[in-house]
């Protein structure tokens, strides 16, 4: 409720003859000094995740930096229902929505929109092994999307050109659940932003990107329609600062830069290896990784040898971590084909690379520089960093150095360096591959932990229906409600 402060100018007391004047001043309930930034969000690998490793995600990191900029604490409030998320913002229960939300006309009418964080395409998603659709007009009734998502807006716009286009909307499933049903063959098609699809292909390689339905959609934060002018001005100032500092580019590279390249066969093989090969060596990775996340060490090992203790290359490197003979001697490995010795030695060498890096490189990025050095040598990595400086780029930012490394293959550039020619593009591919393997390992590890919680203790869950049955039954229920219903123009928009 808006409070009114009545300020009486004591004119009579001051002049002794003037009548009193009453001035009415409106004070917003939000005018009190902010102490907490309440951010509504959705769960998702690129948006917000809270697990044993802590809170991560593009939107989380940006929100955390914004809270620091404001000098307040951050409270992330995850929602599982988009409709409730939007309602919370309208009701001023939260200050901002930071959830990978696409900019649409409907949202622009209801909320204030922050500046663009990044852009995505809306793509049709289908299953590997099924024909790729060529005409959206032939898919009436076969597309399933989330209610209150930008996919509904895309379909509504397409419906103007394809009047018979119909689709299904579900309220109780997110993108990841729809992806899983597509991968199983239980749904035919859905619509997703390109970044979400690329990330989830690392876990569900059966997913395929079909036709692009809408290009370069802006992803933004949402603010309340009223009493948020000050917060919006602060957000704009913060955004300009972060853009100048390269933070947006850094986070885009961190969360999306390594997922652009997708290999169906390789991803399928890796997921099988996690089930069939990794269990024999997991304890060794955990033992020798030390402070390093064991999954990064395991991902590096898979990139090197596909977890084959007897792996051997034409250049003479051998074993799980593909050590050269000089490196093996340096780290105390006598038998490079002994899995435990190789993993221990590889971990020692990788940690040595991390420690040799300049302190100016942040902790979160040191591992990527170290892996590049593991692949082509520390000298070449330092050459790339020096080249970055000469090109007015940041030598401590992996996003910049990964652009420079391929230049070490061009005489124009490597003749300026101390260590000469190097296959820099190979090092970039090497690091990106490890990052993708790591993402998949994290996802599988988290899913395993969730299943352990679900499955134990058995007596508590005796009356529960199998999770897959729940999904099928729920989807069937939704289909009865939404199946091939033609929504009104703009239906499903917040």
From Swiss-Prot:
GO molecular function: peptidoglycan lytic transglycosylase activity
Cell division found in the keyword field: no
Region (Disordered) residue spans: 473-494
Residues at the active site: 304
Main localization of the protein described in the UniProt heading: membrane
GO aspect biological process, one term: cell wall organization
Source taxon at top rank: Bacteria
GO cellular component terms listed in the entry, alphabetical order: cell outer membrane
Segment forming the signal sequence: 1-20
Listed SMART domains: PBPb
InterPro entries listed in its UniProt record: Lysozyme-like_dom_sf, MltF, Solute-binding_3/MltF_N, Transglycosylase_SLT_dom_1
Enzyme class: lyase
Protein name: Membrane-bound lytic murein transglycosylase F
Catalysed reactions listed for this entry: Exolytic cleavage of the (1->4)-beta-glycosidic linkage between N-acetylmuramic acid (MurNAc) and N-acetylglucosamine (GlcNAc) residues in peptidoglycan, from either the reducing or the non-reducing ends of the peptidoglycan chains, with concomitant formation of a 1,6-anhydrobond in the MurNAc residue
Renumbered residue ranges of the record's region Non-LT domain: 21-259
Region span, LT domain: 260-494
Enzyme nomenclature, EC number: 4.2.2.n1
Family as reported in the entry's similarity comment: In the N-terminal section; belongs to the bacterial solute-binding protein 3 family.
Record's function text: Murein-degrading enzyme that degrades murein glycan strands and insoluble, high-molecular weight murein sacculi, with the concomitant formation of a 1,6-anhydromuramoyl product. Lytic transglycosylases (LTs) play an integral role in the metabolism of the peptidoglycan (PG) sacculus. Their lytic action creates space within the PG sacculus to allow for its expansion as well as for the insertion of various structures such as secretion systems and flagella.
Record remark on domains: The N-terminal domain does not have lytic activity and probably modulates enzymatic activity. The C-terminal domain is the catalytic active domain.
Keyword Signal applies: yes
Source organism phylogeny: Bacteria, Pseudomonadati, Pseudomonadota, Gammaproteobacteria, Alteromonadales
CDD domains from the UniProt entry: MLTF-like, PBP2_YfhD_N
Polar residues biased stretches: 473-485
The entry's keywords: Cell outer membrane, Cell wall biogenesis/degradation, Lyase, Membrane, Signal
Compartmental location: Cell outer membrane
Membrane-related topology note: Peripheral membrane protein
């Amino acid at each position: 409720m808006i409070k009114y402060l009545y300020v009486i100018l004591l004119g009579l007391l001051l002049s002794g003859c003037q009548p009193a004047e009453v001035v009415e001043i409106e004070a917003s309930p939000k005018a009190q000094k902010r102490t907490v930034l309440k951010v509504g969000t959705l769960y998702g690998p690129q948006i917000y995740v809270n697990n044993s490793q802590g809170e991560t995600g593009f939107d989380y990191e940006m929100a955390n930096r914004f809270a620091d900029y404001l000098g307040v604490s951050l409270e992330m409030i995850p929602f599982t229902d988009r409709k409730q998320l939007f309602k919370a913002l309208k009701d001023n229960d939260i200050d901002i929505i930071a959830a990978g939300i696409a900019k649409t006309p409907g949202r622009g009418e209801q909320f204030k929109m922050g500046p663009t964080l990044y852009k995505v395409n809306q793509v049709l998603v289908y299953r590997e092994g099924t024909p790729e659709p060529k005409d959206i007009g032939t898919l009436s009734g076969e597309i399933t999307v989330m209610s209150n998502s930008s996919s509904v807006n895309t379909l509504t716009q397409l419906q103007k050109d394809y009047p018979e286009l119909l689709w299904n909307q579900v309220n109780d499933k997110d993108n990841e659940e729809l992806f899983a049903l597509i991968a199983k063959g239980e749904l035919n098609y859905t619509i997703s932003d390109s970044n979400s699809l690329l990330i989830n292909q690392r876990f569900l390689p059966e997913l395929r990107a079909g036709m692009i339905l809408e290009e370069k959609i802006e992803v933004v934060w949402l603010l309340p329609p009223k009493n948020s002018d000050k917060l919006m001005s602060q957000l704009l100032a913060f955004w300009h600062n972060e853009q100048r500092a390269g933070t947006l580019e850094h986070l885009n590279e961190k969360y999306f830069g390594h997922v652009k390249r997708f290999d169906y066969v390789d991803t399928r093989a890796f997921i099988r290896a996690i089930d069939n090969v990794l269990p024999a060596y997991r304890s060794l990775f955990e033992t020798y990784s030390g402070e390093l996340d064991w999954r990064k060490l395991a991902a590096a090992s898979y990139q090197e040898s596909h977890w084959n203790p007897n792996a051997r290359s034409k250049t003479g490197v051998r074993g799980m971590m593909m050590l050269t003979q000089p490196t093996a001697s340096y780290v105390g490995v006598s038998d490079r084909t002994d899995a435990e010795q190789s993993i221990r030695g590889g971990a020692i060498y990788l940690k040595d690379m991390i420690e040799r890096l300049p302190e100016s490189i942040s902790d979160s990025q040191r591992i990527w520089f170290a892996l590049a050095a593991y692949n082509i040598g520390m000298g070449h990595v330092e050459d790339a960093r020096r080249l970055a400086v000469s090109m007015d780029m940041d030598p401590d930012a992996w996003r910049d150095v990964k652009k420079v490394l391929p230049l070490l293959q061009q005489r124009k550039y490597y003749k300026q360096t101390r260590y000469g020619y190097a296959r820099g593009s190979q090092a970039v591919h090497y690091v990106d591959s490890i990052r993708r393997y790591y993402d998949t390992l994290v996802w599988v590890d988290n899913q395993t932990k969730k299943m352990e919680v679900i499955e134990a203790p058995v007596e508590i869950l005796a009356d529960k229906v199998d999770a897959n049955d729940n999904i099928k039954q729920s989807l069937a229920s939704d289909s009865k409600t939404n199946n091939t219903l033609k929504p009104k123009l703009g239906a499903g928009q917040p």
